[in-house]
Amino acid sequence: MKTLEEKEIELIEEFEVYEDWMDRYQYLVDLGGELEGLSEEEKNDDTLIRGCQSQVWLVCDEQEGRLYFRGESDAIIVKGIVALLINMMSGCTAEEVVKYDFGFLDKIGLKEHLSPTRSNGLVSMVEKMKAYAILKLRSEN
């Protein structure tokens, strides 16, 4: 399994392949198209992320001490952002998720190319992932 550092380097290199942001947005749309999606039962108030302009749901499962995220959105670019975060953080331990600074978002320039409301939504998605991880750590103690 790849480390977070290896995943980050790979992701940054992947984004650098695309020279302009229209291509990068298309890459995000393509990533979002690869998401499995969630069942209607999983799309509920507990999994809905507050602070997003569009509807975003995030679910966290745990297997053998590692967290695996699944999610969905009703907006295509946001769905790609969800996929980006899921690809980055799935398979990490709760401690890794809590400690990670999500610096790759700045390194690829994503935050600066989103509207303020979408940027707030991105922060909310990161906070939800960290909240799941904190909950997991607390349940272990």
Model-derived segments and their meaning:
Residues M1-Q55, E62-Q63, L105-E140:
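N-terminal intrinsically disordered, cationic/polar leader segments
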Residues D46-C52, S73, E95-V97:
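Solvent-exposed interaction patches of small proteins and small membrane subunits
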Residues G65-L67:
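Hydrophobic residues embedded in beta-strands of well-ordered beta-sheets
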Residues D74-I77, L84-I86, G109-H113, A133:
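Feature captures hydrophobic
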Residues V82-T93:
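Alpha-helical support elements that line or immediately flank enzyme active sites
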Residues G91-I108:
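Glycine-rich phosphate/pyrophosphate-binding loops
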